[in-house]
From Swiss-Prot:
Substrate binds at R26, Q27, A28, G29, R30, D75, Y150, S205, H323. Belongs to the uroporphyrinogen decarboxylase family. It catalyses: uroporphyrinogen III + 4 H(+) = coproporphyrinogen III + 4 CO2. Pathway: Porphyrin-containing compound metabolism; protoporphyrin-IX biosynthesis; coproporphyrinogen-III from 5-aminolevulinate: step 4/4. Homodimer. GO terms for cellular component: cytosol. PROSITE patterns: UROD_1 (PS00906), UROD_2 (PS00907). Keywords: Cytoplasm, Decarboxylase, Lyase, Porphyrin biosynthesis. GO terms for molecular function: uroporphyrinogen decarboxylase activity. CDD domains: URO-D. It comes from Corynebacterium diphtheriae (strain ATCC 700971 / NCTC 13129 / Biotype gravis). GO terms for biological process: protoporphyrinogen IX biosynthetic process. Its main location: cytoplasm. This is Uroporphyrinogen decarboxylase. The lineage of its organism: Bacteria, Bacillati, Actinomycetota, Actinomycetes, Mycobacteriales.
Length: 344
């Protein structure tokens, strides 16, 4: 039997796919009524450790929207929880640590994940059984800076002042923290790859709060180390608000660089150190603006990507949002956006 072409994997390899591939960050989530139903009475972290549930949630948007990839349903703090860190996800707030890292001793005592997360591996097996050859399963992990910020701040932060203070005031402790996070993140990604994910995204939610200088000194070496250890699948590197960091991020070693909605894709491509596959970058709010606006913005983004490819500044394009699907997005608007994207 001849296998079907896989648009995501083709694009990630710099091969022109048979249709423009698309998936959306947070496509599995609160925008879907079937997600809200299955999550009823189950905490976020519990749902990430139930193989049947995480598989079902991962597959829901693929069935509904005809996106070209499933993104593993998980959370960036799952590897911390699996390692033994006491963390919970508080509704309306996000990940909250029982004991933020306050001292050098706290950092030295931070547990390191040294085993497979078997619940996640089992869920991946279930997902792969349902996906066809044309559909890609993408795994992901939080990047070390973002995890470090949660650990140091104790939860989400508007300014990351404790994190930046540690970086500059005690760089030795900062680098120790990053060195302790790298093996945990790599182990979590290796669990996913060994279980069958076909690509992965390193997601740096908070990197946009850093200057390029700080990013290069305190973050980039560790993201590079992680990406170097998972090179057996295509790698996507994405951060929010990282337009000024794109040059540095493109040095980290991924084939694909995600771009948020603030920077046109053809401009972003020229900031890369070498041609990359671009991922992005529709503003998630445009999904609220009606079909005519969606079509216009999708056409613009596809044209920007195509210009970058034609100029030799990029090697491909995977359509995505510039961040995650917003919780109150109409799922029918997402389905229609996918249909429109597949016409370009």
């Amino acid at each position: 039997m001849v296998s079907m072409p896989n648009p995501i994997l083709d694009a990630a390899a710099g091969v022109t796919p048979h249709r423009r591939p698309v998936w959306f960050m947070r496509q599995a989530g609160r925008s879907l009524p079937e997600y809200r139903e299955i999550r009823e009475g189950v905490s976020m972290l519990d749902s990430c450790f139930r193989p049947d549930m995480l598989a079902e949630i991962t597959l829901q948007p693929v069935r509904r929207h005809d996106v070209d990839a499933a993104i593993l349903f998980s959370d960036i703090v799952v590897p911390l929880k699996a390692a033994g860190v006491r963390v919970e996800i508080v509704p309306g707030r996000g990940p909250v640590m029982d004991h933020p890292l306050l001292t050098r001793q706290d950092i030295e005592n931070l547990p390191i994940l040294d085993h497979d997360v078997h619940e996640v591996a089992e869920g991946i097996g279930i997902i792969r059984e349902e996906l066809n050859d044309a559909q890609t399963l993408i795994g992901f992990a939080g990047a070390p800076f973002t995890l470090a910020s949660y650990l140091v701040e104790g939860g989400p932060s508007k300014n990351h002042e404790k994190t930046k203070s540690l970086m500059h005031q005690d760089p030795e402790s900062w680098h120790l923290l990053m060195r302790r996070l790298v093996p945990t993140i790599v182990q979590f990604l290796r669990t996913q790859i060994d279980a069958g994910v076909q690509a992965m995204q390193l997601f740096d939610s908070w990197a946009g709060f850093l200057s390029e200088r700080d990013y290069r000194e305190f973050v980039l070496p560790y993201s590079m180390e992680i990406l170097a250890q998972v090179g057996d699948v295509p790698r996507i590197h994405f951060g929010v608000g990282t337009g000024e960091l794109l040059t540095a991020m493109s040095e980290a070693g991924s084939e694909v660089v995600g771009v948020d909605w603030r920077v046109p894709l053809d401009v972003a491509a020229q900031r890369m150190v070498s041609p990359k596959v671009l991922q992005g970058n529709l503003d998630p709010a445009i999904l609220f603006a009606g079909e005519d606006v969606m079509r216009r913005e999708i056409a613009r983004i596809c044209a920007e990507a195509d210009r970058a490819i034609a100029a030799g500044h990029a090697t491909g394009h995977i359509f995505n949002l510039g961040h995650g699907v917003l919780p109150n997005t109409d799922p029918d608007a997402i389905t229609r956006a996918v249909e429109i994207i597949h016409t370009f």
